Regions:
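Aromatic (tryptophan-biased) beta-strands that constitute blades/sheets of beta-rich domains
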Residues: 39-48, 83-91, 122, 126-135, ...
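Short beta-strand elements that form the blades of beta-propeller/WD-repeat-like
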Residues: 11-31, 56-69, 73-74, 102-114, ...
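Acidic, small-residue rich beta-repeat scaffolds with periodic aromatic anchors
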Residues: 143-182
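Charged linear interaction tracts used for macromolecular binding and regulation
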Residues: 70, 75-104, 114
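Repeated scaffold domains used in trafficking and secretory/extracellular systems
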Residues: 2-22, 45-62, 88-107, 134-146, ...
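A short helix->beta-strand "capping" segment at the edge of beta-propeller domains
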Residues: 2, 29-51, 78-80
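Structural recognition of the beta-propeller blade-terminating site
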Residues: 77-80, 121-124, 165-167
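An internal, amphipathic alpha-helical element
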Residues: 112, 129, 139-143
Length: 182
């Protein structure tokens, strides 16, 4: 399956259309996503919210579409149309998937980072764990093994990155991940 953000003029035809993140009927649409599934192309409209939108990204794993936008991550099942939303502490940063990190995927399928946190999701889209206070202006993942996730969080922008190591299965902090002492 393929997934991408859409431009208004792409002219695709969709088998289904979903609206995610709307707190009220008639909410304005901030972004459009197309997810190609076995049953056709699903259009997912992301409702506008009052939040910072620094970065946006999409990933697809099995029947799940992961959408990072604003301060939220949406997990949409393209078959059942079930939607789960996770509110982030600060803006969404980036997705990292097990394949990209060259891990087996046994402990997580997708990682999502925010300005200060890291979320781990399983192959069914369920939240496995969340680790907070890894930075204040961005969290990056550099590598992952069956036992550890190595990354860095920005504590003193611009450029004040501090390393951290988390346990892959639990997200428990092994080392780092806190503001440097002055």
């Amino acid at each position: 399956m393929a997934i991408s953000f859409l431009n208004e003029d792409e002219g695709l035809s969709f088998t289904r259309s979903l609206l995610v993140g709307a707190a009220r009927p008639g909410a304005a649409i901030a972004a459009h996503v197309a997810a190609d599934s076995d049953s056709g192309i699903v259009r997912i409209d992301v409702a506008e919210a009052v939040e910072s939108t620094c970065f946006q990204a999409v990933r697809q794993a099995g029947t799940k579409a992961y959408i990072g936008y604003g301060e939220r991550v949406f997990i949409v099942d393209c078959v059942t149309e079930d939607v789960v939303m996770h509110q982030m502490d600060g803006y969404f940063c980036e997705f990292f998937d097990a394949e990209e990190l060259e891990t087996s995927g046994a402990d997580f399928c997708v990682l999502a980072s925010s300005a200060s946190e890291l979320f781990a999701f399983g192959p069914d889209g369920a939240l496995l764990w969340k680790t907070t206070q890894l930075g204040i202006d961005g969290v990056l993942v550099h590598s992952a093994t069956g036992t550890h996730i190595k990354g860095s969080g920005e504590w003193d922008p611009p450029g004040g990155w501090e390393p951290f190591i988390l346990a892959t299965r639990t997200g428990e902090r092994v080392s780092g991940g806190s503001a440097p002492r002055r």
